[in-house]
């Protein structure tokens, strides 16, 4: 038993009373999200009817989860906080640093050898401060959290953008940067702008080829990659009860791709069944005792337009399978229209690799349904046209799938079973290809499909689909294949149709534990060592405080054009090895961003040398000369993962300001936490006024205050000047972070 019984018992004992108190004070019906949020206020004396999308609120989450790539920087910051133990139950999960190459056994052995210094550091820090530690191979953070820690009505933060996966068990689970996680682990208040709430009413029931993944793929097309920003997506309606807990988790997981703060479902019998199957009967008993407050009030779901900021309806009975992409997860296309899209746009029609897994789709049910299709290859005398890669979500899933014949079904097709880890989904894929720059198509059951993300090739057209559809397209090897109507030719020359996928929601024989890989903290005063000459880890030095003056005559480091995700700002893949070494990882800063003035990546004007150079190299030179710089960008800057390195790297290299048309939620918070200025255009057309050789000043910082605009002054190379207003979302506390140099400096 790794979950925290004492904490859970106390939580449920107090939960009903807290919700009743909220209802009495607010004097109105409550959505599920509101019940959970208000029940987690840091100080009940602060209770009032907060304005959604406007008011900042202090919360007290129940727990923290961290993956190994982001945990390094989070724990380096925590070590500077002067605490002996974490204030809430916390865990570290080693899932990001394992590169997919030869297969699970070999890859885990390589990872342990390659990352020994980092793993030892994370294990020792975890032991020292009372943090649970999950070893490499134990599983993907979000699957392990779902199996062991998530609980209905709870609230958690995680240093990974797909933390909302726990919403599949009715939990408000929010992806954050490491500095936010440190707030929670030190027992401080954790600040969040009160989210708006988007209600999604589900009716009907899935059938045939349609899966829970298709719900969120369709919704991504409706909301786009930023339509859920600063909002919680709350699912309700009779259709929710037809979805398994892991299916719900899939939907919540990919809410990150529309920018949602989190997503969640109401507690129901499917969640109870999953909790019991994973050994948490007592959680079910406690949740059932307060089940009326683990869903929205009846009047809310009866009259949703009066209580949600937006209402979207999806009929599961009419839903088609979807394929989203390429290059963005909101390019949603139903399978009935996909072949036409492939031909019209000239996408590489041949599907070169199918990949099943990731935190989004690696549950027992996912593998069970995909395996039912794999078995048809033998049964119908077919062959598989494309290579298949499978990443189970956890050791528990892998061991159970092996016992129940699923692994054998995949391996019979020549599939490579990779480690229970993230692998290709985050760019940890040593792909073997004849030409790493060739145009090609892959289909995955992952969540993101940004350019270069999976394999580093900008010409890999990555499409996101359900595990079932990924498996079918792998068998066919053809993006234009529609398994709902098309047939394949078998070895006998017969035209055969794939039968609809089937599978069990949960294993009939129960879960196999396998080699779990959990290490409980032993509480001893473990010595933590970081070698001074380490290339993987580096102790942090506090950032300097603001000098009290306006920021004057800053050179433009880069004016980024188009999509600029955290992958563009701080690439993962081969750079993951430097996630604990701020100086080294800063070498990748903004190397993927497109320069608006020349259309190139990692090539910007260096005014100190009057030549072009790399982004990080140019910033380093400015820093060495004591010159701060500024970055300008377009919409939804910082979309994607929660990695705070995308904020810490610019701060480390003396970039003081990011001026964008809009920001992704997590990244904007990360910038604020690191003492940077995150500003937005009042008039987005002012973006076009900024020239390559401009010097930019920020005026008004002496009177920096909530709701008060600042002024940007452009000093053009020809001696002329222009100015325009910019806005911000800083409150008094966040302004204090800026003045102190970072949030950590205010502790």
Across the structure, where does each feature detected by a protein language model lie?
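Active-site-proximal loop->helix
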Residues: 191, 399-409, 665-680
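Acidic, glycine-rich flexible loop/linker segments
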Residues: 488-505, 667-737, 744-746
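Accessory "access/gating" subregions that flank catalytic or transport cores
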Residues: 109-113, 118, 123-158, 234-237, ...
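Flexible inter-domain linker/hinge segments
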Residues: 5-7, 16-21, 36-42, 46-47, ...
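Long, structured ligand/cofactor-binding scaffold of large enzymes
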Residues: 8-11, 15, 20-195, 579-631, ...
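Extracellular/luminal Protease-associated
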Residues: 236-241, 624-663
